[in-house]
Amino acid sequence: MSNKSVLLIAGEPSGDLLGAHLAQSLKSLEPNLKLAGMGGKRMREAGVEVFINADKLAVVGLLEILRQFRDIRHAMQTLKRYFKKTPPDLVVFIDYPGFNLHMAKQAKKAGIKVLYYVSPQIWAWRYGRIKKIKKYVDHMAVLFDFEEKLYQKENVPVSFVGHPLANAPTPSLSRNEICKQFNLDPDKPIVALFPGSREQEINKLLPMMVQAGKLIQTQIPTVQFILPLALNLALDKIRPFLSPEIKVIQNDISHVLAIAHAAVAASGTVTLEIALQQVPLVIIYKVAPLTFWLGKKLIRLSFIGLCNLVSPEPVAVELLQQDATPQAIADEVFQLLNNHNYRQSIIGKLGHLRPQLDRGNAAQNVAKVVHNLIFS
C-alpha cells in the first residue's frame, strides 16, 4: 500500500481542469496515492483535497495582479507552511508561471521534488526564466514538441506529453441532437461566443461581442448565438451584458463546437480548442493600456492567440485593443460564414494542427512521469 502524497497546484480554470484529469489518471495508476493542493471545483470533484481555492487567483495583466495581491500572497504563505509541516513526495505545478515558479523555489528549499506541467511560454518572452527552471524544477512535462527540443537543448529533464485538447473525446450525439438539446435550428448559422473565464475579461469583451452580434444579425437575420459559460462563472456575472438572442449554457464546450459554424473568442487556451475542432474563429482581446504597452515591449511575438502561435501559418484574425471593435468583429464573422473560399482555406489550415499535438492521453502520460518521479 502506497503512503505517498502529491500536491497539485493550479491557479486558473484551465489548470484546474488539467489537474482534475491528472488526478483521475493518478488514482487509476496508484489508487492509494494521497492528492491535495490548490485548485477549483474540477479538482475537488476528482478527489483532490483542495485546501486553497484558486477562483480569486485567476488574473491577467500587471495592474490586475496588483488588485488581487492580498489573495495571492495568502496562497503563497499557506503553501509555504504546508511545504514545511506536511511535505509531499512531489509537487506538480500546473501552468500559472508567475506564482508557480516562485513556489517551486520554496518547494526545493523544503527538499521536495518538483514537476512542472505546462511550460511557461519562455519561447515568447522572459527566456531568463530558464535559470529558475534549471535550478528549481526536476522535470518538465510539456504540451508542444518544440518545447521539448528547447529544454533538451538546455539540459533540463523533459517529457513531451502531447496536448490534452488534441486527444479530447468527441460528442456521441449527432449535430441535430445537440441542436435540439440547445433549442437551436441546425439549418441556420450558429456563432459561439467565448468571452473568457476571468471577470475582467467578461467586463471588457462580452459587451463588444453582444454589439457585434447585433451587427451580424442585420446582415444575417437567421444567425444564432450560443455562449458556453465557464465553470467558475455564475450566470449573474454575465447577465447584465447579455441580450435575449444569446443562448447561455453551462460549460459544454465540446457540444457547442460540434455545432458552431464560427466563433468569437478571447485570447487563451480556448482558441486552440476551437481550432482543433476546425471551427473558423476570430480572436479578440483588451487589457489595461499600460499592461498592453508593457507587453509589447517584453513579448517578441507577432500573435497572441495560442492557435496562431503553434501553427506554421496564421489560422485566425486577431483584433487587439483599439482594433477590437464590434464592427471589426462583425465584419470578420460575416466573412467566416459567407465567403466560401475564405472559409474553406481557414478550415484547411486548421486541419493541420491536431497531428502535431496528439500523443495519446496527455493526463496518463503525465501520470506516468509522476509515478516515475515518486517511486524511482
From Swiss-Prot:
Its EC number is 2.4.1.182. Keywords: Glycosyltransferase, Lipid A biosynthesis, Lipid biosynthesis, Lipid metabolism, Transferase. Coiled coil: none annotated. Pathway: Bacterial outer membrane biogenesis; LPS lipid A biosynthesis. It is an enzyme of class 2 (transferase). GO terms for biological process: lipid A biosynthetic process. It catalyses: a lipid X + a UDP-2-N,3-O-bis[(3R)-3-hydroxyacyl]-alpha-D-glucosamine = a lipid A disaccharide + UDP + H(+). One of its GO terms (molecular function) is lipid-A-disaccharide synthase activity. Belongs to the LpxB family. Condensation of UDP-2,3-diacylglucosamine and 2,3-diacylglucosamine-1-phosphate to form lipid A disaccharide, a precursor of lipid A, a phosphorylated glycolipid that anchors the lipopolysaccharide to the outer membrane of the cell. This is Lipid-A-disaccharide synthase. It comes from Coxiella burnetii (strain Dugway 5J108-111).
